[in-house]
Amino acid sequence: MAKRDFYEVLGVERGASEGDLKKAYRRLAMKYHPDRNPGDKESEDKFKEANEAYEVLSDTSKRAAYDQYGHAGVDPSMGGGGAGFGGANFSDIFGDVFSDFFGGGRGGSRSGGAQRGSDLRYTLELNLEEAVRGTTVSIRVPTLVNCKPCDGSGAKKGSTPSTCPTCGGIGQVRMQQGFFAVQQTCPRCHGQGKIITDPCNSCHGEGRVEEYKTLSVKVPAGVDTGDRIRLSGEGEAGTHGGPTGDLYVVINVREHDIFQRDGKHLYCEVPISYTDAALGGELEVPTLDGRVKLKIPEGTQTGKQFRLRGKGVAPVRGGAAGDLLCRVAVETPVNLSRRQRELLEELRDSLEGDSSHSPKASGWFEGVKRFFGDL
């Protein structure tokens, strides 16, 4: 099959600049790279074709020979004096291509050996009192710890791991992708460079075993839902001598029967009787420090809010404590006796027609009258 024109392959004009060539090649390399099209023979062929075209056109002397003689000027098999593909340097192109494939620039090769253990997360349920005052709790956490019989090596006591025959102890293997070679983690030793021929009976060569660890956690006063306590070195054990991960204890404060919390402030609803609301009085309300007396002025309405300063929560990072805000809810009397009913009827009759006793209701009814009068 006759070769396509190299300019046509890259989709550029014959006078294209070096920058245009690079841009066109990079687009095709990204589109047809074998890593993005595994098992696709057509994409692999187009990838090779783009490689060949860019290798020639990006080289000044080869491009001149190609422009004058066509494929014969760069392909020895066609009688020209081309130099094959050994001299091409695509590192500047693939620095960008690999960055797009793997989400970053070309860093150092992944080496085998010690690896840090994973961090763990534990959700700790607390009641409001524990969260506000602080506490110390014991928790039991499932984790991975170093195997004691083999000291975390994975090999049976007295034996030693052998060098991986696949990668020769490097931990990586060289994979050919068309005209290019890339380094990949060795599939046999998983980047460790060594394999265990006589595994430990306790951990079966893993070097770590599952275990429940009991820990004491000191919870500072003032924590709230979502706060985290870090226990350094209490996560999963690392592999092959790597450092241990951390344990993050995440706080979740359960709902309280009386109080609702918003940051450093507490809120509660206080039911009061119809008579206390009308005549005024004094009642006891709960706080986290005990009961306090709250004075209710006469004529108190539902929704009235009273602030008890400093009766909220002291922030975990320091500062003044918040407040307790008590919202009054006036209860309508129920299950009335005959005498109680008579008294309320007498009260209603005595209040009827006097708007000074119910200014809000009077104003509302006046507004309703005006509304219907305007219709």
Curated annotation (Swiss-Prot):
One MF term in the entry's GO annotations: unfolded protein binding
CXXCXGXG motif-type repeats, residues: 147-154, 164-171, 186-193, 200-207
Necessary cofactors: Zn(2+)
InterPro entries noted in UniProt: DnaJ, DnaJ_C, DnaJ_domain, DnaJ_domain_CS, HSP40/DnaJ_pept-bd, HSP_DnaJ_Cys-rich_dom, HSP_DnaJ_Cys-rich_dom_sf, J_dom_sf
ZnF (CR-type) intervals: 134-212
A Pfam match: DnaJ_C
Span of domain J: 5-70
A GO cellular component annotation in the UniProt record: cytoplasm
Keywords: Chaperone, Cytoplasm, DNA replication, Metal-binding, Repeat, Stress response, Zinc, Zinc-finger
Cellular compartment(s): Cytoplasm
Binding of Zn(2+) 2, residues: C164, C167, C186, C189
Primary site of residence: cytoplasm
Entry note: cofactor: Binds 2 Zn(2+) ions per monomer.
GO biological process, any: DNA replication
Binding site for Zn(2+) 1: C147, C150, C200, C203
UniProt remark on domains: The J domain is necessary and sufficient to stimulate DnaK ATPase activity. Zinc center 1 plays an important role in the autonomous, DnaK-independent chaperone activity of DnaJ. Zinc center 2 is essential for interaction with DnaK and for DnaJ activity.
Family: Belongs to the DnaJ family.
The protein's assembly and partners: Homodimer.
Job description of the protein: Participates actively in the response to hyperosmotic and heat shock by preventing the aggregation of stress-denatured proteins and by disaggregating proteins, also in an autonomous, DnaK-independent fashion. Unfolded proteins bind initially to DnaJ; upon interaction with the DnaJ-bound protein, DnaK hydrolyzes its bound ATP, resulting in the formation of a stable complex. GrpE releases ADP from DnaK; ATP binding to DnaK triggers the release of the substrate protein, thus completing the reaction cycle.
Protein's name according to its UniProt entry: Chaperone protein DnaJ
